[in-house]
Amino acid sequence: MLYTHANIITVNPTRDILIDGAILVKDGSNTIDDIGKTDRLVSIYPNEKHKSLEGHIVMPGLISLHVHLAQSLLRSAADDLPLISWLCDTVWKMQGNFTQEDGYVASQLTIAEMLKSGTTTFVEALFAQRYGIEGAVKAVIESGIRGCIGKVVMDQPRYATQTGVSMHEGLIENSNSLNQAVESHSKFHGKGNGRVEIWFGARTPGGVSEELYRKMVKIARANNIGITMHCAEVKADREFFASKEHTPMTYCKDLGLLGPKTVLAHMVHLDTQDLEILEKHGNGTSVAHCPVSNSKLGSGIAPLKEMLEKSIIVGIGCDGCPCNNTMDLLQEMKMASLLPKALHGDPSIVPAEKIVEMATINGAKALGRDDLGSLEVGKKADFISLDLSNKLYAQPLRDLVSAVVYIATGADVATVVIDGKLIVEDHVLLTIDEPKLIDKAKKHGKKLQERAKVDVKGRWKEI
């Protein structure tokens, strides 16, 4: 297929933008076979089928570095609540009552939303055993998305230093969770033509003993298994590290967690020493920046400006539906740019170009994937198109990169191609029956809430 007449943000090493550009993906190929001006490619490949993307902005598929697949069924169930109440009274109670069918439907729902809003690759943070990892893998394979599924690794049920706070009994796992993660890796890693990866989803500091951390790291490094972990998300995390006579990054460094294919989510409460350790000893460690979640839960604002100044690899993640409400990474990208401008009183910092890099090429670096994140010959054919050509709110359309970050939302995504296959065409998801999924999500969400005995009410009276 020859995708023609697009304006292409390549994110290649010279950051070229091709006006009236085209991308060739040959029949049966999963890589970009050629890219350039439309006139040239049409003349060279006269027998290829054409799909016109005239007026569309084409860019690499978005990479979301921090996602909770199961939490889509918890959407809007815990808004405007303090963190501990949010966790104990709603989120953990509902997740602790999941069935494996809930896990499959929730995975489908999260993935469908990501696909329709331009995310082509994601990292799942901590998929619990009770959710049924087979269902998550099935959802990834069926949908066409790329997914790094972090199977939860834990042996402590508490939250940071909150000794009186424990997870719902339905979510508690022991050190055998590491063995289960290894088994899942052996069984599922590489499925779906390589689109499925199984990672270790270390819960949080405080949720994993030092002994289990060290075992996990040893196995991960020996087998090139990715690790993702919530880290320094809330002030209580900082208190936990202090109780161990550590800062967040001295703790991670001591345990051997820092290194390639380690994605640390949130990283809000860091000090100068932490940033210097990441800069000098990170060895490819990356950060999943989640500004919407951190804002909605009152966790704080991550030191994004400082991390980028030290060339730390920072990508972007949407987190989960109870703390974000959508999986629209384009909205997350806008927030990621705006927050540091307001915090530092400087509108020039973290510009649109840097944000696009975070959502594409930086995400690829975080995953250890040199075949993703930019549009170049030989790289995976993962790209999206946004149609702003006839939108009132986008006119007059000038700077394309700026438009992606400050104007576009997931609703503007018209085309999604992953692994060379057309997944979304003219805003229609081709791999999942949307009406059927919506119906299933409503039913499963209702039954789950009833089973968990969670009462969700707004503050205003419904009559």
Swiss-Prot record:
InterPro entries: Amidohydro-rel, Metal-dep_hydrolase_composite, Metal_Hydrolase, MTA/SAH_deaminase. It comes from the Eukaryota. GO terms for cellular component: cytosol; nucleus. Belongs to the metallo-dependent hydrolases superfamily. ATZ/TRZ family. Zn(2+) binds at residues 66, 68, 230, 319. This is Uncharacterized protein C1F8.04c. GO terms for molecular function: hydrolase activity, acting on carbon-nitrogen (but not peptide) bonds; metal ion binding. Pfam families: Amidohydro_1 (PF01979). Keywords: Hydrolase, Metal-binding, Zinc. CDD domains: ATZ_TRZ_like.
